[in-house]
Amino acid sequence: MIFTIVITPVWSATTDAYVRKVFEWINKTLSFSRKVCIASVFIGVLMVLASKFVYGMWLGRGSIDISYSTTGLIFLYISFEMLYKVYGTIINGTGKVFAQMILTGIIAIIYIPLAIFLANLCGLSGVLIANVIVFALNYAWSKLQCNKLISQTATGIWNK
Protein backbone atom coordinates (compact mmCIF):
# COMPACT_ATOMS: atom_id res chain seq x y z
CA MET A 1 0.00 0.00 0.00
CA ILE A 2 2.80 2.43 0.88
CA PHE A 3 4.51 1.63 -2.42
CA THR A 4 1.34 2.45 -4.39
CA ILE A 5 0.99 5.76 -2.55
CA VAL A 6 4.59 6.66 -3.42
CA ILE A 7 4.48 5.53 -7.07
CA THR A 8 1.08 6.92 -8.14
CA PRO A 9 2.07 10.59 -8.61
CA VAL A 10 5.16 9.58 -10.59
CA TRP A 11 3.10 8.95 -13.75
CA SER A 12 1.96 12.54 -14.30
CA ALA A 13 5.24 14.00 -13.06
CA THR A 14 7.10 11.81 -15.56
CA THR A 15 4.91 13.12 -18.37
CA ASP A 16 5.97 16.66 -17.53
CA ALA A 17 9.66 15.74 -17.18
CA TYR A 18 9.65 13.70 -20.41
CA VAL A 19 8.08 16.52 -22.43
CA ARG A 20 10.69 18.95 -21.03
CA LYS A 21 13.45 16.32 -21.58
CA VAL A 22 14.53 16.41 -17.94
CA PHE A 23 15.97 12.91 -17.94
CA GLU A 24 18.07 13.55 -14.83
CA TRP A 25 14.85 13.97 -12.81
CA ILE A 26 13.41 10.78 -14.32
CA ASN A 27 16.60 8.88 -13.41
CA LYS A 28 16.53 10.19 -9.83
CA THR A 29 12.85 9.31 -9.51
CA LEU A 30 13.47 5.85 -10.92
CA SER A 31 16.30 5.34 -8.43
CA PHE A 32 14.09 6.48 -5.53
CA SER A 33 11.21 4.27 -6.70
CA ARG A 34 13.53 1.26 -6.85
CA LYS A 35 14.71 1.97 -3.29
CA VAL A 36 11.13 2.17 -2.02
CA CYS A 37 10.38 -1.07 -3.88
CA ILE A 38 13.40 -2.82 -2.32
CA ALA A 39 12.36 -1.60 1.13
CA SER A 40 8.85 -2.91 0.47
CA VAL A 41 10.26 -6.29 -0.59
CA PHE A 42 12.35 -6.41 2.61
CA ILE A 43 9.22 -5.71 4.66
CA GLY A 44 7.47 -8.43 2.64
CA VAL A 45 10.16 -10.95 3.60
CA LEU A 46 9.55 -10.11 7.27
CA MET A 47 5.81 -10.51 6.71
CA VAL A 48 6.32 -13.96 5.14
CA LEU A 49 8.48 -15.00 8.10
CA ALA A 50 5.80 -13.81 10.56
CA SER A 51 2.87 -15.07 8.48
CA LYS A 52 2.06 -18.22 10.50
CA PHE A 53 1.82 -16.17 13.69
CA VAL A 54 -0.26 -13.41 12.03
CA TYR A 55 -2.59 -15.89 10.31
CA GLY A 56 -3.15 -17.60 13.66
CA MET A 57 -4.04 -14.34 15.38
CA TRP A 58 -6.20 -13.12 12.50
CA LEU A 59 -8.10 -16.30 11.66
CA GLY A 60 -7.81 -18.18 14.95
CA ARG A 61 -5.22 -20.81 15.80
CA GLY A 62 -5.81 -24.07 13.98
CA SER A 63 -8.78 -22.78 11.97
CA ILE A 64 -6.91 -22.89 8.67
CA ASP A 65 -3.37 -23.70 7.59
CA ILE A 66 -1.88 -21.45 4.94
CA SER A 67 1.44 -22.90 3.84
CA TYR A 68 4.67 -20.97 3.61
CA SER A 69 4.82 -21.94 -0.07
CA THR A 70 1.47 -20.24 -0.74
CA THR A 71 2.51 -17.16 1.22
CA GLY A 72 5.92 -17.15 -0.47
CA LEU A 73 4.46 -17.40 -3.97
CA ILE A 74 2.05 -14.56 -3.25
CA PHE A 75 5.02 -12.56 -1.96
CA LEU A 76 6.96 -13.23 -5.18
CA TYR A 77 3.98 -12.28 -7.32
CA ILE A 78 3.48 -8.99 -5.43
CA SER A 79 7.23 -8.28 -5.55
CA PHE A 80 7.35 -8.67 -9.34
CA GLU A 81 4.19 -6.59 -9.62
CA MET A 82 5.86 -3.77 -7.68
CA LEU A 83 9.02 -4.04 -9.80
CA TYR A 84 6.89 -3.82 -12.92
CA LYS A 85 5.11 -0.75 -11.54
CA VAL A 86 8.45 1.02 -11.01
CA TYR A 87 9.16 0.87 -14.73
CA GLY A 88 5.58 0.74 -16.04
CA THR A 89 4.73 4.03 -14.36
CA ILE A 90 7.65 5.75 -16.10
CA ILE A 91 6.66 4.18 -19.44
CA ASN A 92 3.05 5.32 -19.00
CA GLY A 93 4.28 8.81 -18.19
CA THR A 94 6.19 8.96 -21.47
CA GLY A 95 3.13 7.85 -23.44
CA LYS A 96 5.19 5.19 -25.24
CA VAL A 97 2.69 2.41 -24.53
CA PHE A 98 2.43 0.53 -27.85
CA ALA A 99 4.90 -2.18 -26.76
CA GLN A 100 3.10 -2.41 -23.43
CA MET A 101 -0.21 -2.98 -25.20
CA ILE A 102 1.20 -5.69 -27.49
CA LEU A 103 3.25 -7.47 -24.82
CA THR A 104 0.45 -7.37 -22.25
CA GLY A 105 -1.87 -8.96 -24.81
CA ILE A 106 0.67 -11.69 -25.58
CA ILE A 107 1.28 -12.32 -21.88
CA ALA A 108 -2.48 -12.53 -21.25
CA ILE A 109 -2.78 -15.14 -24.00
CA ILE A 110 0.10 -17.10 -22.46
CA TYR A 111 -1.22 -16.76 -18.90
CA ILE A 112 -4.56 -18.54 -19.26
CA PRO A 113 -3.29 -21.88 -20.64
CA LEU A 114 -0.21 -21.67 -18.41
CA ALA A 115 -2.35 -21.13 -15.29
CA ILE A 116 -4.67 -24.00 -16.26
CA PHE A 117 -1.74 -26.32 -16.98
CA LEU A 118 0.09 -25.46 -13.75
CA ALA A 119 -3.14 -25.61 -11.72
CA ASN A 120 -3.72 -29.15 -12.99
CA LEU A 121 -0.12 -29.99 -12.14
CA CYS A 122 0.29 -28.18 -8.79
CA GLY A 123 -3.14 -26.94 -7.67
CA LEU A 124 -3.29 -23.46 -6.13
CA SER A 125 0.50 -23.19 -6.22
CA GLY A 126 0.37 -23.65 -9.99
CA VAL A 127 -1.89 -20.64 -10.44
CA LEU A 128 0.40 -18.59 -8.21
CA ILE A 129 3.46 -19.76 -10.15
CA ALA A 130 1.75 -18.63 -13.37
CA ASN A 131 1.20 -15.20 -11.76
CA VAL A 132 4.87 -15.02 -10.77
CA ILE A 133 5.96 -15.93 -14.31
CA VAL A 134 3.77 -13.36 -16.07
CA PHE A 135 4.73 -10.54 -13.72
CA ALA A 136 8.41 -11.50 -14.03
CA LEU A 137 7.97 -11.20 -17.80
CA ASN A 138 6.20 -7.83 -17.38
CA TYR A 139 9.06 -6.65 -15.17
CA ALA A 140 11.72 -7.79 -17.66
CA TRP A 141 10.29 -6.08 -20.75
CA SER A 142 9.28 -2.91 -18.87
CA LYS A 143 12.77 -2.51 -17.42
CA LEU A 144 14.24 -2.93 -20.91
CA GLN A 145 11.90 -0.37 -22.48
CA CYS A 146 12.24 2.11 -19.63
CA ASN A 147 16.04 2.01 -19.81
CA LYS A 148 15.89 2.54 -23.59
CA LEU A 149 13.52 5.51 -23.19
CA ILE A 150 15.60 7.18 -20.48
CA SER A 151 18.88 6.67 -22.36
CA GLN A 152 17.12 7.95 -25.50
CA THR A 153 18.09 4.82 -27.46
CA ALA A 154 14.54 3.49 -27.91
CA THR A 155 13.66 2.71 -31.51
CA GLY A 156 10.91 0.81 -33.28
CA ILE A 157 8.25 -0.72 -31.06
CA TRP A 158 10.03 0.54 -27.90
CA ASN A 159 9.55 4.17 -28.97
CA LYS A 160 5.87 4.09 -29.97
Q: What is each residue range found by the language model?
A:
Residues 23-38, 46-50, 68-71:
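Interfacial transmembrane-helix starts/ends
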Residues 37, 71-74, 78, 104-108, ...:
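Residue-level recognition of transmembrane alpha-helices
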